[in-house]
Amino acid sequence: WYVWADPKPDGTPPNNWLSVFGGSAWAWHGGREQYYLHNFLASQPDLNLHQPAVQDALLDVARFWLRRGVDGFRLDAINFYFADRYLRDNPPLPRELRNDSIAPSVNPYNHQLHL
């Protein structure tokens, strides 16, 4: 259900992705011996929306509420729903293009430009 990835050969996270709150977007899970992706808090792992079972479950939730008469849904942080399937490093954004709304000092990468 989540985005899991093996560490690099040296044991570090699978890529250079950063959390919105700073630091790596990856947290180690000792039981699986893998990293899981969290774009926000480590206690909020990202769902793997590339998986059909996850998509189906979310559609079931939407149908549940639609049958109860809700008028719509608010989808928060939608730009974080899908990650690069190949988990490639984010390319550095040239310094002259950085600003606080695109690439603040805590995140010198252009967020998932290669999607």
Which residues does each predicted region cover?
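Alpha-amylase-like alpha-glycosidases and glucanotransferases acting on alpha-linked glucans and related
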Residues: 1-115
